[in-house]
């Protein structure tokens, strides 16, 4: 995520510098001051490579980055900071209606058999996508690889039910903007 934010900020800096050199304002949807010095000030290197980052560095860059992420629009009425926090954490974004999740893969297609990372990812997939039998890509201890962790040790992700689906769990606001009543 750091690399994505860094690349995005460099693109924005170059885009804005060209626009200002031609006498035009920068990106119309970009906030006027994404980081200290504003968009138009010369930045010799990527901001993440500098010694200290200004306050709200990630949040400010991700607001601009959100303009380019059409696949994850912030849910209506949900706090922007909570949506961006979830986006940075890499999960828990509600699925847009009428679309399928990208990780709907058959078992064993996530990586080589000796990859611990693929074993962890497959262990987190729902049981119905793995099949009723034991994992066919589970690793044999006699081959020298680590055994696949048992699903009982992993905490299942909390899925939003129909009642909860309409509200942001962090700020207790519904997507329509009303506060939850106790």
UniProtKB/Swiss-Prot annotation:
Superkingdom, taxonomy of origin: Eukaryota
Record field: compositional bias (Polar residues): 42-53
Low complexity bias (residue ranges): 129-138
Region (Disordered): 17-53, 128-159
InterPro entries: DUF4644
Entry protein name: Uncharacterized protein C16orf90
Species of origin: Homo sapiens
Gene name per UniProt: C16orf90
């Amino acid at each position: 995520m750091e690399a994505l934010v860094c690349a995005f900020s460099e693109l924005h800096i170059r885009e804005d510098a060209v626009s200002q050199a031609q006498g035009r304002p920068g990106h119309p949807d970009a906030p006027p001051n994404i980081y200290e010095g504003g968009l138009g000030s010369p930045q010799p290197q990527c901001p993440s490579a500098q010694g200290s980052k200004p306050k709200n560095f990630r949040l400010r860059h991700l607001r601009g980055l959100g303009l380019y992420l059409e696949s994850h629009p912030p849910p209506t009425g949900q706090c922007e900071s909570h949506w961006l926090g979830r986006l940075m954490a890499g999960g828990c974004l509600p699925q847009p209606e009428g679309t399928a999740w990208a990780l709907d893969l058959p078992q064993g297609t996530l990586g080589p058999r000796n990859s611990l990372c693929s074993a962890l990812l497959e262990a987190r997939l729902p049981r119905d996508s793995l099949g009723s039998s034991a994992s066919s890509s589970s690793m044999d201890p006699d081959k020298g690889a680590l055994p696949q962790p048992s699903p009982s040790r992993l905490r299942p992700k909390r899925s939003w039910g129909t009642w909860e689906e309409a509200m942001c769990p962090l700020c207790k606001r519904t997507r329509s903007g009303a506060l939850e009543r106790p």
